Amino acid sequence: MTKLLITVIATCVASVLSAAYEGDKIQAHAWIGETVYMMIPDNMAYEMIPYNCTTNQGVSIKLYGLSPVAYAEDTKSRNLRLRKDILVDLSSTKDAKDLREMPPPAVCEIVVSASSTQGLREFGPLQVRIIDRVLPPVKDWKYFLDLWQHPWAVSRYFNVKPFSKEHYAAMEPVWRMLASGGVKALTVTLLDLPWNHQCCDAYHSMIERVKNNDGTWSFDYKIFDEYVEFGRKCGIGPDIACYTMCPWGYVVRWKNERGEICRVKAVPGTKEFEDYWGDFLVDFTRHLKEKGWFENTYIAMDERSPEDVSKIAAFIQKKSPGMKIAMAGNRKPSEFKGIVVDNYCQYLGYLTDDFLKELAPRREKGWKTTLYVCCSPGYPNTFMESGDEESFYLGAFPAICGFDGFLRWAANSWPHNPYRDTTFGNWKPGDTFLVYPNGEASIRFIYLRNGVVAAEKIRLMREAGLLDAKELQELNKKYGYKDALDRKLDMKKFEEAINRLVNR
């Protein structure tokens, strides 16, 4: 990150997360065990808040600045704009000179320990009101957040060998930041280019396969095993989403005993498909069961047709009975007749009232249903041009209408230098990542996380009998997906309404 970008002044968003004004004070609400991120208004006397991490009866605070980064207003004209997006830890400053070179305070992190008690804590003009409810550790959240990780983007950016010791060291702060937001699925690749080459960096297989001269197959799970263990150590999981048995274009590859790369088009239902995947599924199942990972593993697919999914699902159950299937799709689950999709993710732009009626029956069967956005819709989303409250909406909205969580296709598929320009190709800037290379969160990720926390609170309050279905129905009616897609919602009012609900 250059000093130029650090010192450029851009417009600061003066919204507040989980906070409210009270005279010349600003008040935040938090549950016991919660970490709150709130914006500091421009007119707040932030000089009164200590820069270094300060503790008061089980509550600590830390201040962050927001450093601006460039993005293309129009990918064709390349006119650049600035947005304050990168969280910068101000407690790491060494002296006054360092401080002058840092952005001003913009975000306050409030950490309430699990041993804290109900009451009010004061930090200068900031008051933190602790509510007598407990938010469990992030590993115990039930909300299913799935943000696809990209190891090869880290390898390229830091110029380290994929899956070397140096690579894992570079990945760790990014993966831990994602885990802090509640990411529950580790993105694993079973082949090269599961989605073609749509990012700056290509995905490759984590399982090397060799076809022997006698026609048998050999599989090397070394990288797969190391990566799963690494991801879980960082806090991501326990689920393992394996992409995919149905790549875009159907092309798969392997090596022969001479090390030559061979390719074939393996369309579901064909002999080529069965030859390529049959022995693998049997051996992969054996390996997963030996590791104790089978129950948490999904064969995952992305926007595949019902015809393809039907053939793949039947083949999976033939070769690996009990293997789960995950699917990000733009159709209702009922269109996949006779197919058990254990984790179905619905595109927001194709959401319907009829689809919402399927959520409760799926949950009763033990199946997950989540919501996703990608390069569309234009609103709400998590682009650089998106309002911060859009990210909060995407995190919290699933909880008020019966979804189990949220998915986005790119957590860290960075462009060449995301600290200079977040634009890549024809994608809208910010579409390809939410966390920066050194593990810094974007403000878009922070707002999404706060929405996830609100959703988790809604779940806990419902289970405790503190919320009834009617209240959520009213919220869904007032802040529903149709008005959101039509840009008719005041997202700030939605955020305020949700925070009033969960912190009452």
What are the language-model segments listed below?
Residues 343-427:
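Catalytic-core region of carbohydrate-active enzymes that cleave or remodel glycosidic bonds
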